[in-house]
Regions:
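C-terminal capping alpha-helices of c-type cytochrome domains
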Residues: 78-81, 92-113
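Electron-transfer interface patches adjacent to heme c in soluble/periplasmic c-type cytochromes
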Residues: 61-75, 89-99
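Short, functionally important structural connectors and interaction interfaces within domains
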Residues: 56, 61-64, 80, 85, ...
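Periplasmic/extracellular electron-transfer cofactor-ligation site
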Residues: 26-59, 86-92, 107-113
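N-terminal export/targeting leaders of redox proteins
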Residues: 1-25, 110-113
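Solvent-exposed, polar/charged alpha-helical surfaces in well-ordered, non-transmembrane soluble domains
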Residues: 29-33, 37, 75, 79, ...
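Membrane-targeting and insertion segments and their boundary/processing signals
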Residues: 5-6, 38, 47-51, 55, ...
Length: 113
């Protein structure tokens, strides 16, 4: 194979992989809307957790802005949202909606600073 053809194939591959990863990122604005509709009842307006929920389920909720939560990968967070985590039941969302919620929760750490 000619060198120029090999370079062209590598370039196409790099572009495709970049687009694939870019497509996986959510929309924080949409995520805030979904969070408000489906998550705020337990997690609170800014993801700080609600004391009544903690008491009801005998759990200590980590703030979504915490280092412990923010250090998780998007994939880990998506699994927790879609499959549930401990006493948190799975949330019925499409994968794209879950990605949007995760993008929004990433903004909570920035607001904390």
């Amino acid at each position: 194979m000619k060198l120029s053809l090999k370079l062209a194939l590598v370039l196409v591959l790099v572009i495709c992989v970049s687009l694939l990863f870019a497509a996986g990122k959510g929309d924080a604005k949409k995520g805030k809307e979904i969070f408000t509709a489906k998550c705020v009842q337990c997690h609170g307006e800014k993801g700080e957790g609600r004391p009544a929920i903690e008491k009801m389920f005998s759990v200590k909720m980590r703030p979504l802005s915490s280092k412990e939560v923010q250090s998780k990968t998007d994939e880990q967070l998506q699994k927790e949202v879609l499959d549930g985590n401990g006493k948190m039941k799975p949330v019925k969302l499409a994968q794209a909606e879950a990605a949007d919620v995760i993008a929004y929760t990433r903004t909570l750490a920035a607001e904390k600073k």
